[in-house]
């Protein structure tokens, strides 16, 4: 059950819902195997010069085009076939995301879906035959349906209807059924349905009229976990008996604390969960479903990010979020003893999946200079690499490794960051720089491959990925430090980040811009509007410009955390003046620096009107503005053709306004 729980979390991430601040954060669940590329915690008292001195020496670096960067293959997802001879996964190599299958020994890919327009993602492989489950929306509108593709290739929509959103949860332990959530009855809430594996006959199991977030189902099919977001920093966990409807609160606590379910044990005796009510960081616990007594399972000086079992409980995997990287450990499911893993490829491990037999796993390796590559490991054997994702034209040595650095902000709060330094930057060859702001609020900039940032670094830009106050991964006090303060203290952290960059001898201190996606796009606009003299240029990628509109137009299926969002950002009914004060569109007359805006026309979270309005308002100032709209994208640009256009235009814009080099001109 546990791996399905993780896959559900990964799916939630794809649609912008993290376990902590669920509406906005886009947080990659990734892991680093112990001893394989895990970054040690830097000295928090290190001076900027000391931090800079640990970076690699200056060296020549070949520059690559955006076409060459995007020509690397993107892959994710991993599902073993019923006989474990093949693996199901996703790739956008055709120009949109489609589902593919390949032998676990490697070899040719077989296309399971062949869409030329809408993205398809694998949800599961059926346990006893060749059928597969996939999900698909329309042009990025996030109204996903669940489809079954038969062994004959015929596709059937299992969740027909208009304006609904459905998601696969998991198969029952006996594989006679599978579970699906859908908001077809009430667009605000997701109900739980059970489908018969053979006939697809559907039964409503849980009528969700109170806005719970649905979780895992126990192997004996008696229990369902429910989550409830009170605020972005406080949530409760419940377990409901499906036969009687009796709900038991698991999360008795005082004060603000977050509780997140981590699935049931395979014998249905224990419910595992993480909670941070005993300190700054989330620890792993379990509660007996017989007497409701709680036990601590694992704690660390960082958040326990997730934990799950193999199918029959032989193994348990746990990951901790450690300073922008996540460390994975494997345990014996019965004794709890840690199991030494065989030598695995260095780098971050993502999307680890146990086979049904518990004899092998599939996972992705991802590093700063390495996009996702799929591996299969038979326990007792050596890992087999199934994909070669990096464009062979690109020499990994020309890409850059990241470094964790810290600086003190305006009020002495220590701010963690991820730094990308171009090979060619030096005190004699100072480079322009960018402050990169993650999504959220409540996201986290992490280590790992980022094609856009590597592209910018490859073309001579220092990039500082700030984890401003309010970011996840650094304790609940730090996480809550931005509540009700957006457009103020978190923004002032970005100004302090600029000052940190100016302290580095290889940065041109007069050529520093700001860039971000989603909430990071809002921060970009806020920086240009509220701190107009600080940054030389801004790039807003589908960012909020008007909090009033955004909060009043949220999709109905966000109802379960609408009030928590109001607590975080502001209530449009009772805090209208505050939201106007913190919305850049109402202060666009103060924006005097060049601005670029990129937007998906089908974005349901930051609607296109947000970008239309800020672009029109800034143009009235006589400021250089470039606006790029993709008609077939939503909240994120998933199609390689659009990435090539969008990312390429970002570099051209930055080169013109930070380097003074027009598109197509030869750079020195």
Residue ranges and their predicted role:
Residues 388-510, 517-518, 552-562:
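Cap/lid segment of the alpha/beta-hydrolase catalytic domain
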Residues 53-66, 70, 290, 307-319, ...:
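Extracellular/periplasmic ectodomains of large secreted or surface enzymes and adhesion receptors
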Residues 468-668:
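Active-site-proximal cap/loop segments of hydrolase catalytic domains
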Residues 37-40:
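Bacterial signal peptide processing site
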Residues 1-20:
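N-terminal secretory signal peptides that target proteins for export/translocation
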């Amino acid at each position: 059950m546990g791996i399905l729980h993780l896959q559900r979390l990964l799916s939630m991430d794809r649609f912008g819902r993290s376990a902590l601040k669920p509406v906005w954060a886009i947080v990659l669940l990734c892991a680093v195997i112990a001893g394989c590329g895990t970054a040690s915690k830097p000295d928090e008292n290190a001076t900027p010069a000391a931090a800079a001195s640990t970076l690699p020496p200056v060296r020549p670096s070949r520059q690559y085009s955006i076409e060459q960067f995007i020509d690397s293959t993107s892959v994710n997802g991993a599902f073993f076939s019923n006989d474990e001879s093949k693996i199901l996964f996703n790739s956008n190599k055709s120009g949109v995301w489609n589902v593919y299958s390949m032998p676990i020994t490697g070899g040719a890919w077989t296309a399971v879906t062949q869409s030329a327009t809408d993205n398809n993602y694998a949800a599961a492989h059926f346990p006893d035959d060749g059928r597969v489950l996939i999900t698909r929306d329309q042009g990025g509108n996030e109204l996903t349906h669940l489809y079954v593709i038969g062994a004959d290739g015929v596709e059937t929509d299992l969740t027909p209807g208009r304006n609904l959103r459905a998601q696969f949860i998991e198969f029952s332990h006996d594989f006679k059924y599978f579970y699906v959530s859908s908001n077809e009855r009430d667009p605000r809430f997701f109900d739980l349905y059970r489908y018969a594996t053979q006939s697809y006959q559907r039964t409503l199991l849980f009528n969700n009229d109170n806005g719970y977030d649905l979780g895992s189902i126990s192997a004996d099919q008696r229990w369902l976990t429910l989550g409830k977001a009170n605020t972005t920093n406080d949530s409760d966990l419940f377990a409901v008996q499906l036969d009687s409807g009796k709900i038991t609160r698991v999360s008795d606590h005082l004060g603000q604390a977050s509780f997140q379910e981590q699935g049931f044990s395979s014998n249905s005796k224990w419910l595992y969960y993480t909670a941070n009510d005993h300190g700054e960081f989330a620890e792993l616990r379990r509660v007996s479903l017989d007497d409701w007594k709680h036990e601590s399972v694992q704690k660390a000086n960082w958040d326990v990010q997730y934990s799950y079992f193999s199918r029959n409980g032989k193994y348990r995997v746990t990951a901790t979020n450690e300073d922008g990287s996540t460390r994975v450990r494997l345990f014996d499911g019965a004794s709890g003893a840690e199991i030494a893993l065989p030598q695995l490829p260095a780098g971050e491990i993502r999307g680890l999946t146990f086979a049904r037999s518990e004899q092998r796993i599939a996972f992705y390796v991802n590093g700063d200079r390495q996009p996702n590559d799929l591996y299969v490991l038979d326990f007792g054997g050596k890992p087999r690499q199934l994909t070669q994702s990096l464009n062979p034209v690109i020499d990994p040595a020309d890409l850059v490794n990241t470094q964790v650095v810290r600086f003190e902000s305006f009020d002495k709060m220590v701010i963690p960051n991820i730094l990308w330094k171009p090979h060619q930057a030096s005190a004699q060859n100072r480079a322009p720089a960018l402050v990169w702001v993650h999504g959220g609020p409540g996201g986290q900039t992490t280590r790992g491959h980022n094609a856009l940032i590597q592209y910018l670094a490859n073309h001579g830009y220092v990039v500082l990925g700030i984890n401003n106050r309010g970011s996840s991964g650094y304790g609940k006090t730090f996480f809550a430090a931005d509540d009700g303060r957006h457009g103020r203290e978190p923004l002032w952290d970005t100004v302090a980040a600029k000052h940190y960059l100016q302290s580095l001898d290889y940065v041109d201190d007069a050529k520093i811009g700001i860039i971000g996606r989603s909430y990071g796009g809002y921060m970009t606009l806020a920086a240009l509007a509220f701190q107009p003299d600080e940054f030389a240029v801004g790039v807003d990628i589908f960012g909020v410009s008007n909090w009033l509109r955004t909060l009043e137009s949220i999709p109905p299926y966000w109802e379960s955390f609408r009030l928590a969002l109001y607590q975080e950002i502001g209530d449009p009914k009772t805090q209208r003046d505050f939201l106007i004060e913190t919305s850049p569109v109402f202060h666009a007359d103060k924006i005097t620096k060049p601005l670029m805006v990129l937007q998906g026309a089908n974005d349901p979270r930051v609607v296109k009107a947000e970008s239309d309005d800020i672009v029109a308002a800034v143009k009235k100032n006589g400021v250089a503005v470039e606006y790029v709209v993709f008609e077939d994208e939503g909240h994120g640009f998933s199609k390689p053709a659009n990435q090539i256009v969008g990312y390429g235009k970002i570099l051209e814009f930055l080169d013109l306004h930070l380097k003074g080099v027009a598109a197509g001109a030869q750079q020195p």
